[in-house]
Amino acid sequence: MKPYLLSAKQLIDKVKKSELSSVDVANSFIERIEEFEKDVYAWAFFDKTSFLEKAKEADDWRLSGKPLGPLHGLPVAIKDIFKTDDMPTGYGTPIKEGQRSRNESEVVRLLKNAGAIIMGKTVTTELAYFDPGKTTNPYDYSRTPGGSSSGSAAAVAAFMAPVAIGSQTNGSVIRPASYCGVIGYKPSYGLISRSGVLRLSFLLDQVGIFGRTIEDMGLISKAIISKDSKDASTRIYPTENMESSVLQDHPFDPKFVFVQTPKWKNLDSDSKKAFDRLRKKLEKNIVDFQDPSSFEKIFEYQQIIMETDMAHNLSYFYETNKNKIGKKLKEAIERGQSYKSKDYAEAVDNIETLYDNMSELFHHFHAIITPATTGEAPKGLAYTGSPEFCTIWTYLGMPSISLPILEGSNKMPLGVQVVGEKFDDVRFLRSANWLLKKLKK
């Protein structure tokens, strides 16, 4: 099997056993990039020579007999809003194009410490908001890959990278994962540091992972989950044996609750039929849940927090380069400047209250099942799709994952979103793995 087809765990194991060299792995992905990048446009920065040099260094380290990190020799793609000291960080805007930083992001530092090779930077929408970059969907180049982690999802879907790092402030991991037919995992808020990452909102920004297996989600999470003094949201979380723990069988089959959310009316008819079929397959393991009326307010609360924070955090771009930023971003910043402080305070105060109400479900169920998107990836590249099926879970800081289980009428991927209890990510991933195995049979 060609190296680019292997999972991250398989690649690491083969390199450590000397069945593959890191250079072999790098060359396999380089060939793939050279074949498909001209159509997918997943990369904001990729330097073949530098990638091969890093792979050679990884091989030299291994052959010297020195201890190997858990991700030794693994290529990882990074969304172009994470600072890297040896590559430019452009944030998806010409304002920052080609600029470099000496203050590397904590996620990148942890990946390197674990032995990973940062292979390049993936395309993001403009300043991680809605105005799209150049990336296309690998399943259909005429369709959007979603956003804002467009390039990260597309690179994994096109087998140009085994895993990739992205971020989500509303639906920027789950949505592109669904559209591109890969696994996209957003851990609980506070597990992964945002230090050295373009900030939109302290309360909403969350780091995510793209890959092809649940095991790889556990493997990468174990490397980058860490308390960080530079990010006050982070906490200590046990990650020992996380990559194997997520694969363990439940002592009994997990129970799921199906949540339509108030946006169910916006789900296209084909997707509704697909989810009806899914519920029938899981009939012994799933029950329906009546959305509480408080769910409706979450969409307003999330928008108030996100846009108010963007008005503050992106003020440099707005004040110095207003004519160089997109219309959607400019309008969001201007709305953020207009909200009243009491409305912002109400939106913030309700995060904990609404989560407490929601968490009662987990006394009876292992996880929530809900759509990831309103349907297949939309035609055209100007619109990255609606994040509305992700909004509630991002606002509440709950772990969520998009699983490539369903298919739309145009044979495009359709993700199933699974949502778990806050800070119970291992059990949540175990439930997601059970679901993936059962429905992929």
Mark where each language-model region is.
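Short, well-ordered beta-strand elements within core beta-sheets of diverse protein domains
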Residues: L11-K17, K96-Q99, D205-R212, E334-Y339, ...
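Acyltransferase
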Residues: S22-N27, S269-Q290, S315-T320, Y344, ...
